[in-house]
Amino acid sequence: MFKKLFGQLQRIGKALMLPVAILPAAGILLAFGNAMHNEQLVEIAPWLKNDIIVMISSVMEAAGQVVFDNLPLLFAVGTALGLAGGDGVAALAALVGYLIMNATMGKVLHITIDDIFSYAKGAKELSQAAKEPAHALVLGIPTLQTGVFGGIIMGALAAWCYNKFYNITLPPFLGFFAGKRFVPIVTSVVAIATGVVLSFAWPPIQDGLNSLSNFLLNKNLTLTTFIFGIIERSLIPFGLHHIFYSPFWFEFGSYTNHAGELVRGDQRIWMAQLKDGVPFTAGAFTTGKYPFMMFGLPAAAFAIYKNARPERKKIVGGLMLSAGLTAFLTGITEPLEFSFLFVAPVLYGIHVLLAGTSFLVMHLLGVKIGMTFSGGFIDYILYGLLNWDRSHALLVIPVGIVYAIVYYFLFDFAIRKFKLKTPGREDEETEIRNSSVAKLPFDVLDAMGGKENIKHLDACITRLRVEVVDKSKVDVAGIKALGASGVLEVGNNMQAIFGPKSDQIKHDMAKIMSGEITKPSETTVTEEMSDEPVHVEALGTTDIYAPGVGQIIPLSEVPDQVFAGKMMGDGVGFIPEKGEIVAPFDGTVKTIFPTKHAIGLESESGVEVLIHIGIDTVKLNGEGFESLINVDEKVTQGQPLMKVNLAYLKAHAPSIVTPMIITNLENKELVIEDVQDADPGKLIMTVK
């Protein structure tokens, strides 16, 4: 029950990222447009008074503001797209449903435009009744004030309607309305019902949200910012932080702008105050990110590099430099945070506490900087330095330097004190047990706690998936010693990364548990040894080309811990734009998984590559895939290997991102080209 709910929350959290991703563009337009009206800047650059420049700046400001004014609609459309696999029909259904829901609430409660205008008049007079209005004018519709929550509710319902009815069959005389055309129709009916229910259910919910907002923001805002920072960072590993911060950014708090309109939410209030040119009172739930993202985490990356083994410093230095620079410039911290989250959780605990104090310190100092993307240098320039007199953004620099020092010394001390296995400090060698191919499944079964400890057994092309009865009986170190490159633990679910042989291990373990095969007896084998030297031909260089038309992304951005953590090997992520996967080099097909979602290839020089089409696509049981080749077949670079129904994958798989992994890199060097747009003729990697 909990795990199912957890999975649904993760999906919702990811869906919310789509509308949030629009905000940086809107924020840039609003910030630059507003800055061009800044009196101090106009004094320095009088040419900004030119009528054409004034018109351009006004258009930019208005273009940015209209996005923030209509966030609920964007959340409705974005949530539907995210939860329905990106299908445009779901977005259309959400748009129609959102309009109908608001119109229904307005009619049921007899809300008129006069009610809205009377509020606007009261807001200008700052009357008590005008501070927390229950009504709003949404796209010209007088209705209840449901904010972004209303958009999310309707978007989720539209996605549910799409997933439920997109392939519905109707009688022949209604055939035109079958399939996806039926989705907006049924969503309209659902929207009417939702509007009626919310007409009576939302007012008490609204009162509760207002009370919670007042309590958090007015009773002890200093403590609230500290707790907010801790919880927000703590939820990063689970992907639930988007759900947590959304009410703070888009609903909690209120401000009446110069037009008499009520603006809700910390981020939206900050943008409204930016446009109005008044002192900032918002930003308590955004400003705290700047010190630890721009200064703290890059310093932590340096501490990790400093403590790496000498022979691994070059590799670790490159990784940490890239991750630290990304955090500093853009505020994207996940590549750096995930580099130590699983191998050294104590460091992440330190990081979480420091993040909480960062929010607290920024609030105590009165620093108020908005953001639309994250707390990196780019947002710092746009929303901090351009408004330094109102935001007090210059204080971020000395505070950030202090945080850099604290992060560095705490990470350095913890790594050495607790002998943490951060990148570059892994054991030189892992003891590998001598287990033959025949004995391996027996040994893995023993390491999992034996037959009685196995509740469910499964596998995909990369990992053995086992649900156990008692996790304490599992010998994780023993599983790694048997050749697993990593073991993930989620509750009582164990995932052992054995690579392409995972499915065979599962198959043999199932037969062992059913009694079909028994443990082989120990046999001593004597081989005749030759005194003749063995000549090994150098493999040389292997060029690896794109497996289709699409986008290349770093492996660290693949939404799967096993691939992103390079447990299977190094490589890249590929986002296909056309439904055809082609051979990346001349070679041989070594493996085609029974569910067709993954292909193993070997080049003529012996380099082994795994192409895993999508994430968790093993669960599709072959639906959406059409294999064009056979095992042991010779293929040439660019030859089609698999036809893929991308629309089906987008609707039924968590992601279509396709990891492309070198599984036998070992002591060879992998050079990844600086490529984003790819096609079958473009070089993306070279193995030397």
Curated annotation (Swiss-Prot):
**Would the keyword Transport turn up in this protein's UniProt record?**
yes
User: Which UniProt keywords are present, listed alphabetically?
Assistant: Cell membrane, Kinase, Membrane, Phosphotransferase system, Sugar transport, Transferase, Transmembrane, Transmembrane helix, Transport
Location in the cell: Cell membrane
Task: Give the record's membrane topology.
Answer: Multi-pass membrane protein
A GO BP entry: phosphoenolpyruvate-dependent sugar phosphotransferase system
Q: Which Gene3D superfamilies match?
A: Glucose Permease (Domain IIA) (2.70.70.10), Glucose permease domain IIB (3.30.1360.60)
Q: Which PANTHER family match?
A: CYTOCHROME C-TYPE SYNTHESIS PROTEIN AND PTS TRANSMEMBRANE COMPONENT, PTS SYSTEM GLUCOSE-SPECIFIC EIICB COMPONENT-RELATED
Name of the protein this chain belongs to: PTS system glucoside-specific EIICBA component
Q: What species does this protein belong to?
A: Staphylococcus aureus (strain MRSA252)
Lineage summary: Bacteria, Bacillati, Bacillota, Bacilli, Bacillales
Please state the gene responsible for encoding this protein: glcB
